[in-house]
């Protein structure tokens, strides 16, 4: 019984772009994969990290990982958009075999419980 392959795309954004713009890029690439007929399995912000060597005079970068499955056509669309973007300094897509990755909960991405939201509204 063979499992359907999936793809993992890791890309590095320039470290000097604002947080709002980082979110815009993440959303744009997720939507691009979905529009190409693939399913987004997982999307992780790995944060700002030091690079092993300077890339385009940058010593740090904002790492983002995007896991998706589909027929492979979405990879060309995604990589072309990343190649043309000035904010993406490096990207790599790897075809994975085996079980699909389980969705991970990234700290800070969990919604607040309703009781905490109501308490914050009362205090304000």
From Swiss-Prot:
Residues 99-124 are annotated as: Disordered. Residues 114-124 have a biased composition (Low complexity). InterPro entries: Ribosomal_bS6, Ribosomal_bS6_CS, Ribosomal_bS6_sf, Ribosomal_S6_plastid/chlpt, Transl_elong_EF1B/ribsomal_bS6. The keyword rRNA-binding applies. GO terms for biological process: translation. Belongs to the bacterial ribosomal protein bS6 family. This is Small ribosomal subunit protein bS6.
